[in-house]
A protein has these predicted regions:
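Ankyrin-repeat and related helical/solenoid repeat scaffolds used for protein-protein interactions
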Residues: 86-145
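N-terminal segments that cap or nucleate solenoid repeat domains
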Residues: 1-43
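C-terminal capping region of solenoid repeat domains
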Residues: 6, 16, 125-126, 133-194
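Short, contiguous, helix-prone interaction/anchoring segments in small proteins
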Residues: 31, 36, 40, 49, ...
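Short, solvent-exposed loop/turn at the beta-strand->alpha-helix junction
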Residues: 2-4, 24-32, 52-59, 79-86, ...
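Alpha-helical adaptor scaffolds
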Residues: 49, 56-66, 72-93, 101
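Inter-repeat linker/turn residues at the boundaries of leucine-rich repeats
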Residues: 14, 38-41, 65-68, 92-95, ...
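Conserved hydrophobic beta-strand positions in leucine-rich repeat
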Residues: 17-21, 43-48, 70-75, 97-102, ...
């Protein structure tokens, strides 16, 4: 991996508002270095997919005053869990976020609820949070938040995946519950050999 300062020089746009470090495998160490870089104070868009960043790295970024102007944070395909998402949801430096992509991380219900209940993320309009570990409670919290906030574009896994049909007793007629039932059915059908 090249040094983070070298990557910043290579990929920071001339106006210093966009930085795309996709697939650079910077990890937490690189994320911490980003959080202290003086070259990123004007940054509006930070793109960090597939960089092996965990909660430690995203906490450094979310808590860095360097990112107070950030409107777009793309951190899909990392290893960020609920703890990292909670830091984003509470950090005063993330208050200008309009777009957050957490696609393909390790976020569960707790992280989704933290985003849904966040007072800090009041400007968030686009949330991409599919392919995580969020279940019904988290999805429902986000959908309720969408109704009462500016969150216009919510991309979550389909709720149909979490609804299960209840099996009734009538559906149990053909179920076999013991070896004795197997033998009895085999005898009835003439399939049992002596």
């Amino acid at each position: 991996m090249a040094s983070v300062e070298y990557l910043i020089k290579q990929f920071l746009t001339p106006d210093k508002k966009n930085l795309d470090l996709s697939n650079q495998n910077i990890g937490d160490k690189g994320a911490v270095q980003l959080s202290t870089s003086k070259n990123l104070r004007k940054l509006k868009k930070l793109i960090l997919p597939n960089n092996n960043i965990s909660d430690e790295g995203i906490a450094a970024i979310a808590n860095s005053e360097n990112f107070k102007n950030l409107t777009d944070l793309d951190i899909y395909g990392n290893v960020i869990s609920d703890d990292g998402v909670k830091v984003i949801a509470k950090s005063p430096h993330m208050k200008n976020l309009k777009k957050l992509s957490l696609y393909g991380n390790l976020v569960e219900d707790e992280g989704a609820i933290a985003i849904a209940e966040s007072q800090t993320l009041s400007k968030l309009k686009h949330l991409f949070i599919t392919s995580n570990r969020i279940r019904r409670e988290g999805i429902e919290s986000l959908q309720k938040a969408k109704c009462r906030t500016r969150l216009c574009h919510l991309h979550v896994d389909d709720m149909k995946d979490f609804y299960y049909e209840e099996v009734t007793d009538e559906d149990d007629e053909d179920l076999i519950n013991s070896w004795e039932e197997i033998k009895a059915r085999a005898e009835k059908d003439g399939d049992l050999e002596d």
